[in-house]
Swiss-Prot record:
Catalysed reaction, written as an equation: RNA(n) + a ribonucleoside 5'-triphosphate = RNA(n+1) + diphosphate
Protein name: DNA-directed RNA polymerase subunit beta
Gene Ontology biological process terms from the UniProt entry: DNA-templated transcription
PANTHER family named among the record's database cross-references: DNA-DIRECTED RNA POLYMERASE I SUBUNIT 2
Keyword Transmembrane: no
E.C. numbers: 2.7.7.6
GO molecular function annotations of the record: DNA binding; DNA-directed RNA polymerase activity; ribonucleoside binding
CDD domains: RNA_pol_B_RPB2 (cd00653)
Entry GO CC: DNA-directed RNA polymerase complex
InterPro entries reported in the protein's UniProt record: DNA-dir_RNA_pol_bsu_ext_1_sf, DNA-dir_RNA_pol_bsu_external_1, DNA-dir_RNA_pol_su2, DNA-dir_RNAP_su2_dom, DNA-dir_RNAP_su2_hyb_sf, RNA_pol_bsu_bac, RNA_pol_bsu_CS, RNA_pol_bsu_protrusion
Length: 1141
């Protein structure tokens, strides 16, 4: 959810560098003081990547493609430096007028005539380039989008376990960023084969000869007289380099004419041509590192050393295995540490926004290259200029295509602040160049040890995408090659230093790393334990002495993502439920009055401030003026900073985006002070739900199957009320019969309908509307045809007579309504940019207050979700000794089997916090209990005891945190003591008002003639096969007939039934449904002549008559049989056209 003022000046870029200042101090239960390594900016992954692209990426792509020469080599086009101009339109205007927030890109282009050396130079406009906003999103056609980071396999050299161990022993592959794959396979029969681009295999020595490794002796000498190579040479029939080249050509291009030149070109083109083969910088780095080579970094094609090095590594491992085990029966667990695996984070890298956009830009430039070549050839030398020869359409369309339709450019999730933050930190293994849902193996989806501190092991979707979409861990960052790094504190001789180093998964394996909660002397930094639990080299967990430790975790939070780190007592929850908890926080609706949790984790502040949803002061100063929509701060140097607040805007998901000032006039502020709250924050902290008093007890069976009972107080006092904003749009177009018109003059409209419309037929702001009300009056001309020229002339002379128009007004859809909060009007006359054929457009925003209702979904932060089954009056709810009724009743059976005990601990600590932890005069205190190092059971017991001693005795709380509750209806106490306390409850976006739906008459499908399905189509309820069986089992024949005919696809029957209902007559008996006729047609299409028979007696009489005629004809010798005309299988009259076809 983007909530920042819209300044179109570059100084705004500085705003993100301000360090936010905490407003609310929490009582902390943290057992560890984290190192000085503060959290990095949580959306840095987006911002820095795009900045790098702007600074270097464009320049690099232009250098790669430059120069473009024509086919004869006489002309060249070179690309020089580039520059961006200021965006012509502000972010706010882009959002209201459906424009893209972009800056014009200009590139210096030189056209060179090689013969004369003449150079013509010009700045060429390369199109508008979408810009990233300061909070890491893009505005494309007026909607906010996020480019998700892609998780892909890194190019490089790999030796891996084979897919089929009965055929191969090991496989090795050289994977480029772009180009042909080279794969080596050690066969169980004891030789080595090679595949290029997954084509047919050939002995590896054939390729080696073709690449110029020499004859058999030289090859053997190069590979240390390996027996595998000797076996391979025995299978190799080629005798010379030329033979080998021709053999490679035959395997790669079967059926093409073979000659030596083509063969040499093929091999050179496959691996050594920079245009067709690109290892990329990352690939070269990985290959050099893995094979211990020192090929220069800028060589991005394969070299002979790469191929030799990979083969050496493969042969070394294979021969070592052969010494101990027989090929075909190998225990791979024993040699796993020597092999590479796809899931290892040293072999997977991130393609961040910048790289993805750069790839789209490169594709556009290469498309443009072809056009430029053709133009240089066809145009006249005198008239050619850079402007005429460069066509920028392909570049603009490639960029547009990426932002508009790439799988990784997504409609931003703005349900609340956390949803937007999580979306920007998402890692997606799918998309172009990634995996597909169907082909992704289990291993890729699984948690891997190298995820530690890099990708969250908990937060991932539950459906078919599980494990393919992840979240960046809190402290993780991305290095220059796209590998994820995580921070560790350096340990020297058993003493922990304050030096923090970021390590990638590859580097980490060479060290021994201790946990964050290793006991350390705060004064000296020495590790006090005699033995330390640590991950040793290679990743196994062991105990070591303090002197052996090289690094130590920075914080226990570094393993999990932001959403997961917001779950208190995460360590007491089962992982499956924690996953649901993390995911459901992203679906929480911002409430009317936001409230931070009593029991937090200390991450709430950074999670809210880094997203740009709260307003931070850019400079220190004094607040001079505060209104609901503006804050003015006078800086210390005397200048003014003005901040615009967003008021009641609609998010992508229809929730409300609103900012409220927190400062008062005259208040002194520092740089980074929180000036205004967003819609789901409170005092600058993330606030997704409400602290409610819950009791764990059954109540009349209403909390069966996780259902929830709530008090009517939550409805009356708007505790769980949220605002939702819907947008409706109408366009007045040009039609064949004339233009549509937005007007108050609607045919056959009563005064009641027009009551809230202004003179132009547009609803006034503040009007309350319900379903069916007119929002914008619009009429469309109707008529059989265009008027003749004579008619037009008469009309021109005598003036326009009332033309035939039909009402096509914009009305509030079925089941919706609310208060009109804003109207935006755009017209061609006012100079607005509208789609072709549209003269005028009106947008109406309608806000609804949604109170909590039965059927709404509530959830805690521990995956404890349920649907409200009953709203009980306050006086009937169970109450405590002091008369306080509880707000929510949850089922106790939902806890043990789900193993999310965190909710119970939260409830106990929440109760103590609500009473000020026995201090603070009984006023609530906000506490923080960080994940994996927060409050213990002893801490909670101590807090409860303190509250019991200091002033909350009247509640009757016992030592274990339980109370006696009394039945609100009878006043009798319940038999057993009950756990009661404060839990943070979220209202989720799955609201009953959006789901409830009923249909009387509505649209039908053209194909099947059955009602459409779904609320959006105003469809019916599907009465499926199993439901039909149920009615058949009860013998409810008439009910079933009605459901299958007049309520479904009996076209005539349904019209007659409607007529009968209107006239108050009995409903006639149904006729044949359309689906039966489809079945008939299908059978006829199989050549079966299916003829419906209606009147059996009439048919038998007809048959008898026909037999009599036949006998008479035979007696007279007359042939009265006739051939059936070809192509007409069914010659019966359509006897059931009475039933309506």
């Amino acid at each position: 959810m983007r909530v920042r003022p819209f300044f179109n000046d570059s100084s705004w870029r500085r705003a993100n560098l301000v360090t936010p200042i905490v407003r609310r101090k929490r009582h902390s239960y943290a057992r560890l003081q984290s190192a000085d390594a503060q959290l990095p900016n949580l959306i840095q992954i987006q911002l820095s990547s795009f900045q790098k692209f702007m600074d270097e990426g464009i320049r690099r792509t232009l250098e790669d493609i430059s120069p473009i020469e024509d086919y004869s080599g006489s002309y060249a086009v070179e690309f020089g430096e580039h520059r961006f101009e200021e965006p012509p339109v502000s972010i706010e205007e882009c959002m209201s007028k459906d424009k893209t927030y972009a800056a014009p890109l200009f590139v210096r282009v030189r056209f060179v005539i090689k013969e004369t050396g003449e150079v013509r130079e010009q700045d060429v406009f390369m199109g508008d380039f979408p810009l990233m906003t300061d909070w890491g999103t893009f505005i494309i056609n007026g909607t906010e989008r996020v480019v998700v980071t892609q998780l892909v396999r890194s190019p490089g050299a790999y030796v891996m376990e084979p897919k089929d161990p009965t055929k191969q022993v090991l496989t090795a592959s050289l994977m480029p960023h772009r180009g042909s794959w080279l794969e080596f396979e050690v066969e169980t029969k004891g030789y080595v084969s090679v595949r290029i681009d997954r084509k047919r295999k050939l002995p590896v020595t054939v390729l080696l000869k073709a690449l110029g490794f020499g004859g058999p002796e030289e090859i053997l000498a190069r590979f240390g007289n390996s027996w595998l190579i000797r076996n391979t040479l025995e299978r190799d029939d080629t005798t010379s380099r030329e033979d080998a080249l021709l053999e490679v050509f035959r395997r790669q291009r079967p059926g093409e004419p073979v000659n030596l030149e083509n063969a040499q070109n093929l091999v050179d083109g496959l691996f050594f041509d920079p245009k067709r083969y690109d290892l990329s910088e990352v690939g070269r780095y990985k290959v050099n590192k893995k094979l211990r080579l020192d090929v220069p970094r800028d060589v991005h094609t394969l070299t002979i050393e790469d191929i030799e090095g990979l083969l050496r590594r493969l042969l070394g491992i294979a021969e070592e295995v052969a010494e101990e085990e027989e090929f075909g029966r190998i225990n791979y667990e024993r040699i796993r540490h020597k092999l590479d695996e796809y899931e290892h984070f040293g072999n997977r890298r991130l393609r961040t926004v910048g790289e993805l956009v750069q790839e789209a830009f490169r594709i556009g430039m290469y498309r443009m290259e072809r056009v430029v070549r053709e133009r240089m050839t066809t145009q006249d030398e005198e008239s050619i200029t850079p402007q005429t020869v460069v066509n920028t359409k392909p570049v603009a369309s490639a960029i547009k295509e990426f932002f508009g339709s790439s799988q990784l450019s997504q409609f931003m999730d703005q349900t609340n602040t956390l949803a937007g933050l999580s979306h920007r930190r998402r890692l997606n293994a799918m998309g172009a160049g990634g995996l597909s849902r169907e082909r992704a193996p289990i291993e890729v989806r699984d948690v891997h040890p190298t995820h530690y501190g890099r990708m969250c092991p908990i937060e991932t979707p539950e459906g078919p995408n599980i494990g393919l979409i992840g979240q960046l861990s809190t402290f993780a960052r991305v290095n220059e090659y796209g590998f994820v790094q995580t921070p560790y504190r350096k340990v020297e001789d058993g003493r922990v230093t304050d030096e923090v180093e970021y390590l990638s998964a590859d580097e980490e394996e060479e060290y021994t790393i201790a946990q964050a909660n290793t006991p350390v002397d705060l004064e000296t930094g020495r590790i006090t334990a005699e033995t330390v639990l640590a991950r040793s080299r290679g990743g196994d967990v062991t105990t070591v002495s303090p002197e052996e430790v090289d690094y130590m975790d920075v914080s226990p939070v570094q393993t999990v993502s932001v959403a997961t780190s917001l779950i208190p007592f995460l360590e007491h929850d089962d992982a499956n439920r924690a996953l649901m908890g993390a995911n459901m926080q992203r679906q929480a609706v911002p409430l009317l009055r936001s409230e931070a949790p009593y029991v937090g984790t200390g991450m709430e502040f950074r999670a809210a401030t880094d997203t740009g949803d709260v307003l931070l002061a850019r400079n220190a100063g004094t607040v001079e003026r505060v209104t609901a929509s503006r804050i003015v701060v006078r800086r210390e140097d005397g200048g003014l900073d003005e901040y615009a607040l967003r008021k009641f805007a609609r998010s992508n998901q229809g929730t409300c985006v609103n900012q409220r000032p927190l400062v008062k006039e005259g208040e002194e502020v520092e740089a980074g002070t929180v000036l205004a709250d967003g819609s789901s924050t409170d005092q600058g902290e993330l606030a997704l739900g409400k602290n409610l008093l819950v009791a764990f007890m059954p109540w009349e069976g209403y909390n069966f199957e996780d259902a929830i009972i709530i008090s009517e107080r939550l409805v009356k006092e708007d505790v769980l009320t949220s605002i939702h904003i819907e947008e409706y749009e109408v366009q007045a177009r040009d039609t064949k019969l004339g233009p549509e018109e937005i007007t108050r003059d609607i045919p056959h409209a009563s005064d009641d309908v027009l009551m809230n419309l202004d003179a132009d037929g547009i609803i006034r702001i503040g009007a309350e509307v319900s379903s069916g009300d007119v929002l914008v009056g619009k009429v469309t001309p109707k008529g059989e045809s265009e008027p003749t020229p004579e008619e037009k002339l008469l009309r021109a002379i005598f003036g326009e007579k009332a033309r035939e128009v039909k009402d096509s007004s914009l009305k509030v859809p079925h089941g919706e309504g609310g208060v009109v909060i804003d109207v935006k009007r755009f017209s061609r006359e006012a100079g607005d940019d509208l789609p072709p054929g549209v003269n005028e457009m009106v947008r109406v925003f309608v806000a609804t207050k949604r109170k909590i209702a039965e059927g709404d979904k509530l959830a805690g932060r521990h995956g404890n979700k349920g649907v409200i089954s009953k709203i009980v009056p306050e006086e009937d709810m169970p109450f405590m000794e002091d008369g306080t009724p509880v707000d929510v009743i949850l089922s106790p059976l939902g806890v043990p089997s789900r193993m999310n005990i965190g909710q119970i601990l939260e409830t106990h600590l929440g109760w103590a916090a609500s009473k000020g932890l026995g201090e603070n005069g009984g006023e609530p205190v906000f506490v923080s209990t960080p994940v994996f190092s927060g409050a213990t059971v002893a801490d909670i017991n101590e807090a409860i005891d303190k509250v019991r001693r200091n002033g909350a005795a009247e509640v009757g709380m016992s030592g274990g945190g339980k109370v006696t509750l009394y039945d609100g209806r009878t006043g009798e106490p319940f038999e057993n003591k009950i756990t009661v306390g404060y839990m943070y409850i979220l209202k989720l976006l799955h609201l009953v008002d959006d789901k409830i739906h009923a249909r009387s008459t509505g649209p039908y499908s053209l194909v099947t003639q059955q009602p459409l399905g779904g609320k959006a189509q105003f469809g019916g309820q599907r009465f499926g096969e199993m439901e039909v069986w149920a009615l058949e089992a009860y013998g409810a024949a008439h009910t079933l007939q009605e459901l299958l005919t007049i309520k479904s696809d009996d076209r005539v029957g349904r019209v007659k039934s409607y007529e009968a209902i209107v006239k108050g007559e009995n409903i006639p008996s149904p006729s044949v449904p359309a689906s039966f006729k489809v079945l008939l047609k299908e059978m006829q299409s199989l050549g079966l002549s299916v003829k419906p028979i209606y009147d059996v007696e009439a048919v038998s009489e007809e048959d008898q008559e026909r037999r009599d005629w036949d006998e008479a004809a035979r007696a007279l010798g007359i042939n009265i049989s006739r051939e059936e005309p070809p192509g007409q299988l069914d010659d019966t009259p359509d006897t059931f056209s009475r039933g309506g076809m």
